[in-house]
């Protein structure tokens, strides 16, 4: 996905990527050049929330994978609340996107990226300190949009 955005040449993108990807010096250099910055998954990494909102304020488009991992079965998993917190704090539209792989082997299959209608800030505005319930509602809204894009109305690709 970072290569797709970079090759499009349309806009400036930043990506949230798992910190393990930054351990190899060459790969770290490469993905940083593509606009990636690390997140410590599973640790409630709040600094990534601040860095994400800073990137958005700088006029960059943020690409985040709210599930925190890729799907092994093609189904959309549970999203993390970080995506909701970033959405609430940034005050910008969220464009849901779903990546669909036609084959079982992701690296050897045709990929389709589907984009949904933007979720507008006024639809998710909750104030400066959203409650856990509000964050769950925002996350559910965004993940529901992604699920519909990936799995369709009947729950399949």
Identify the meaning behind each predicted range.
Residues 1-43, 51:
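Catalytic core of membrane glycerolipid acyltransferases/transacylases, capturing the structured
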Residues 47-157:
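Non-catalytic C-terminal accessory region of glycerolipid acyltransferases
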């Amino acid at each position: 996905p970072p290569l797709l955005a970079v090759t499009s040449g349309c806009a400036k993108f930043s990506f949230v990527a798992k910190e393990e990807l930054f351990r190899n010096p060459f790969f770290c250099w490469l993905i940083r050049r593509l606009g990636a910055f690390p997140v410590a998954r599973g640790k409630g990494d709040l600094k990534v929330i601040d860095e994400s909102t800073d990137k958005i304020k700088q006029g960059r488009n943020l690409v985040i994978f709210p599930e925190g991992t890729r799907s092994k079965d093609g189904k959309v998993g549970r999203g993390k609340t970080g995506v909701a917190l970033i959405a609430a704090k940034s005050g910008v539209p969220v464009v849901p996107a779903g990546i669909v792989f036609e084959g079982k082997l992701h690296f050897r299959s045709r990929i389709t990226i589907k984009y949904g209608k933007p979720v507008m800030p006024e639809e998710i505005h909750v104030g400066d300190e959203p409650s856990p319930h509000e964050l769950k509602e925002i996350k559910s809204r965004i993940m529901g949009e992604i699920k519909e894009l990936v799995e369709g109305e009947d729950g399949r690709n």
